[in-house]
Amino acid sequence: MSKVSDLFDVTWEDMRDKMKTWREENYRNSEHVIEVGEELINEHASKLGDDIWIIYEQVMIAALDCGRDDIAMSCLQELRRQFPGSHRVKRLTGLRFEAMERYDDALQIYDRILQDDPTNTAARKRKIAIRKAQGRNSEAIRELNEYLEQFVGDQEAWHELAELYINELDYAKAAFCLEELILTNPHNHFYYQQFAEVKYTQGGLENLELSRKYFSQALKLNNHNMRALFGLYISSVHIASNPKASAKMKKDNVKYATWAASQIKKAYQLAGRTMTDTQTSLKAVEDMLETLQITQS
């Protein structure tokens, strides 16, 4: 097999820097990581200094993604020799067991880590990930709630809990989690969009109004958010057709829906898709606009 350095005329420093970039950007093209990482380890280990150990870890995780347990085990053995007793290396052992679906073995490792260090967030999160992988969502929810009592600022955990509640159709609790995220991330359009989707799913005029407002805010923060634009359209349409809505509310929401539909039409025209796709999409939007005109009349 040809070497990466020969194929692309790059130096070992280039490959080292590329591995660093992939780590920092959470790049998940695992086959590339293995290819570049293995060449660095096999051909340039003496030049890498302490960087060699993070590359071993990076290659190991990529190997687990690709089902290459032989490579993963080789990297893990090197890390164990260098860092005997390290909690980080023990967690990597747990990840290998997870990849092999040996969940009980992985849980034993994470429990031992937590006995030594109850504040080890990585081990606690892996336990929760195992509950999810096993389909034991109620246990994952319980453990996430316990975790957030101690680490209330962990935004990733709040979002994971929201997703679990959505999967369990517990929309009120999902909305609470998303509100927590909005409070700490008031400029993140995705959280507004997701909160709006939850309120829309809950239904009822009050929730629909909240849904429309949060879709609107998501669009203000990111005017390219097509999902929020469609959300604004559909929530406005449902409010306009709700028998409990006042005449003014209906009129206002027809206006919002008409605006959203016109923006959707513009977006399709600018998207540069194939003519057939564009014509089909535009016909759907024109039907939307025609429906609104009928409603308004």
Swiss-Prot record:
TPR repeats: 87-120, 155-188, 192-225
Record's keyword terms, sorted: Endoplasmic reticulum, Membrane, Repeat, TPR repeat
Lipid bilayer topology: Peripheral membrane protein
Pfam families documented for this protein: TPR_EMC2 (PF22890)
GO cellular component: cytoplasm; EMC complex; endoplasmic reticulum; endoplasmic reticulum membrane; extrinsic component of endoplasmic reticulum membrane
Gene3D superfamilies per record: Tetratricopeptide repeat domain (1.25.40.10)
Subcellular location, principal: endoplasmic reticulum
GO biological process, one term: protein insertion into ER membrane by stop-transfer membrane-anchor sequence
Signal peptide: none
Subcellular location: Endoplasmic reticulum membrane
SUPFAM superfamilies: TPR-like (SSF48452)
Similarity section: Belongs to the EMC2 family.
Record text on subunit structure and interactions: Component of the ER membrane protein complex (EMC).
Reported function: Part of the endoplasmic reticulum membrane protein complex (EMC) that enables the energy-independent insertion into endoplasmic reticulum membranes of newly synthesized membrane proteins. Preferentially accommodates proteins with transmembrane domains that are weakly hydrophobic or contain destabilizing features such as charged and aromatic residues. Involved in the cotranslational insertion of multi-pass membrane proteins in which stop-transfer membrane-anchor sequences become ER membrane spanning helices.
Protein name per UniProt: ER membrane protein complex subunit 2-A
Source taxonomy: Eukaryota, Metazoa, Chordata, Craniata, Vertebrata
